[in-house]
Amino acid sequence: MEWSLTQNKLLAFHRLMRTDKPIGALLLLWPTLWALWVATPGVPQLWIMAVFVAGVWLMRAAGCVVNDYADRKFDGHVKRTANRPLPSGAVTEKEARALFVVLVLISFLLVLTLNTMTILLSIAALALAWVYPFMKRYTHLPQVVLGAAFGWSIPMAFAAVSESVPLSCWLMFLANILWAVAYDTQYAMVDRDDDVKIGIKSTAILFGQYDKLIIGILQIGVLALMAIIGELNGLGWGYYWSIVVAGALFVYQQKLIANREREACFKAFMNNNYVGLVLFLGLAMSYWHF
């Protein structure tokens, strides 16, 4: 019986950290890899790459824990989130806080193996991860904070590799914010009706009938910024082809969200994993020496 209870608790932690739903970690991973490849340039040192890949998964898990902790009194009123571990009682508030601390401590121990500049930047990463879940109560732009939180690995990656944060770094950071606002607005469109009822704020609510248009403008901005990064770093044809393919994926997403149907909007959100992957493959191809 004790083993059964322990197993159930571990499964609840697994769900709380969203390790069964890797999309969030992947959307955090791709910009991290973009930054590592541009900063190096090419293939980064194995240990630095390992630290960042592990850090992505750990901090995304920590972010999910604090997000559910912040939303624990709201999630029970939303159909999609009512059965999450905290509102369902599978995990207590004390356990969630302890799990968050453990995940952050492991992440920080990994960062301590890197240089001082990266360690200092990691403090801001923790602050962003903690603040984001609470922003949806106070502003209709929590997605901007999410973009900053998901993109903070970019200056950290540049700092870890070169101990500098050049113009390309900040252009990539801005591109990631625009991308995150676009894809998380698609995600928020799924819950828009429920969010209005319970008082949660989002860009999907703020943009209203102009949501599709603004998402499209943001996506164009992402492509333009990534093209500028390519020019600044002398990237090859493979990279620019990846931007074209990413643009085609954005067009596909626009078709999916055309009628604002929940399942289609969620499918559009999920499709952004391929955008990140394609852009990374383009970068890798540019630095590949045949």
Curated annotation (Swiss-Prot):
Keyword Metal-binding: no
Chief location: membrane
Keywords annotated in UniProt: Cell inner membrane, Cell membrane, Magnesium, Membrane, Transferase, Transmembrane, Transmembrane helix, Ubiquinone biosynthesis
Pathway the protein takes part in: Cofactor biosynthesis; ubiquinone biosynthesis
Function: Catalyzes the prenylation of para-hydroxybenzoate (PHB) with an all-trans polyprenyl group. Mediates the second step in the final reaction sequence of ubiquinone-8 (UQ-8) biosynthesis, which is the condensation of the polyisoprenoid side chain with PHB, generating the first membrane-bound Q intermediate 3-octaprenyl-4-hydroxybenzoate.
InterPro entries: HB_polyprenyltransferase-like (IPR006370), Prenyltransferase (IPR039653), UbiA_prenyltransferase (IPR000537), UbiA_prenylTrfase_CS (IPR030470), UbiA_sf (IPR044878)
A single Gene Ontology CC term: plasma membrane
Transmembrane parts of this sequence: 23-43, 46-66, 99-119, 141-161, 163-183, 213-233, 234-254, 268-288
Organism annotation: Shigella flexneri
Gene Ontology biological process: ubiquinone biosynthetic process
Protein name: 4-hydroxybenzoate octaprenyltransferase
GO MF annotation, one: 4-hydroxybenzoate polyprenyltransferase activity
